[in-house]
A protein has these predicted regions:
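Conserved beta-strand segments of alpha/beta enzyme cores
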Residues: 21, 70-72, 125, 193-195
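Hydrophobic packing residues within well-ordered alpha-helices of enzyme cores
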Residues: 11, 57-61, 215
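N-terminal nucleotide-binding beta1-loop-alpha1 segment
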Residues: 1-16, 39-41
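Catalytic-core segments of class I nucleotidyltransferases/pyrophosphorylases
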Residues: 43, 100-101, 108, 112-121, ...
Length: 225
């Protein structure tokens, strides 16, 4: 599942006229980079949640056949998205009962997504891909010790927006309810049911217009190299 329903407030005015997921870097929309990596990793079915200007995403991507994928859309109120956990819960009927890969549309990362397809959760409710903390999020999100993600004070790493998730993680959330994912992940960590790994490769959280411009410059430089 790709989470693509966000309003993108910090990227306005660009996101006044397009959804953040369609913002381009290196000549491609952010969500297209994600979809191409998912297809290359062997995924074939992808659910995308939509809210703000979501019709533009659906019009651009269609059924996904051009990317070798079968896309389904989970639609939310355009001006009242359900947040991360709410979006997952709302798409539960499309996702089914098996663990699934979860990816934020507004990140760029060279993590090998095929590793998520091969991973078993082993009783955990989620497995998080973490990264060293960027300057804009120096405090991090979770500790990582012996493959377990936790809530201790330090040292922490940043959640990349990439995970393997058991649908049971969002069982407390009813379809149509608004809910954040972070409290559910913290509860899973407290219960010893959150695993993780550290990715030291390329990862960018594209939360602002400045970071989008930086990623665009990086990708275009790589193309020229």
């Amino acid at each position: 599942m790709i989470l693509a329903a966000g309003r993108g407030e910090r990227m306005r005015p660009l996101t006044d006229r397009m959804p953040k997921a369609l913002a381009e870097a290196g000549g491609k929309a952010l969500i297209v980079w994600q979809l191409e990596r998912l297809a290359a990793a062997g995924f074939r079915e992808v659910v995308i949640n939509l809210a703000w200007l979501g019709a533009q995403i659906e019009a651009r991507l269609g059924n996904g056949s051009a990317l070798g994928l079968a896309l389904q859309y989970s639609r939310e109120p355009e001006t009242a998205p359900l947040e991360s956990a709410g979006g997952i819960a709302n798409a539960r009927a499309l996702l089914g009962a098996s663990p699934f890969a979860l990816v934020n549309a507004d990140v760029y990362c060279d993590f090998d997504l095929a590793a998520l397809r091969a991973r078993a959760l082993g009783g955990h409710l989620a497995h998080l891909v973490l990264a060293p903390n960027p300057p804009h999020h120096a405090a991090g999100d979770f500790t990582l010790r012996s493959g377990k993600a936790g809530n201790a004070a330090a040292p922490r790493y940043t959640y990349t927006g990439i995970a393997l998730v058991d649908p049971a993680l969002v069982a407390p959330v009813r379809p149509g309810d608004k809910a954040q994912l972070a409290p559910l992940l913290r509860a899973a960590a407290d219960a010893g049911r959150l695993s993780g790994e550290l990715h030291r490769g390329l990862w960018r959280d594209i939360g602002t217009a400045g970071r989008l411009a930086d990623l665009d410059a990086l990708l275009r430089a790589r193309t020229k190299a």
